[in-house]
Amino acid sequence: MSHDTIFAAAPVPPSLALPYPLILGRAGLAGFPSPAQDYEGRLLDLNEHLVKRPAATFFIKVTGDSMEGFGIHDGDLLVVDRSIEPRPGHILVAMLEGELTVKRYAIIDTHPFLCSGNPRYAPIPLVQHECQVWGVVRSVIHEYPV
């Protein structure tokens, strides 16, 4: 999976925070709350919610289908944190043999691999490739077609 664009994270001014009602729900329920239901209004700042360390965060837009099994699809926007130490199971953005890629870091039989979330792509053994980790994916922003 390669990239289209890398965007630096910049704090969003508080004036751009959007109001949202505090509504608690369960997965599987959909719809709107009763208009008569009391709720407390709050402000939601997506930058505050998604970006934990602004100085170490960047965004990258995904192209390709290699990570679909992990819920990362073509066109998704990834929030990547450079300050997180990579561990097995993390989704990484890495420079692999001169190409930017997004893969899941795994240890298989004591050897490090970068793995796709699509069975069409074989795991990549890191002992055979030059690899530089750029960061760990913290969040995925996925837009549904409307």
Stretches found by the model and what they are:
Residues 55-57, 87-92:
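Short, hydrophobic/aromatic-rich segments at coil-to-beta transitions
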Residues 75-76, 90:
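Structural motif
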Residues 1-68, 99-100, 107, 111, ...:
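Short, positionally conserved secondary-structure boundary motifs
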Residues 96-101, 131-132:
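Short coil-to-beta-strand transition motifs
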Residues 113-119:
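Catalytic Cys-His active-site segments of thiol-dependent hydrolases/isopeptidases
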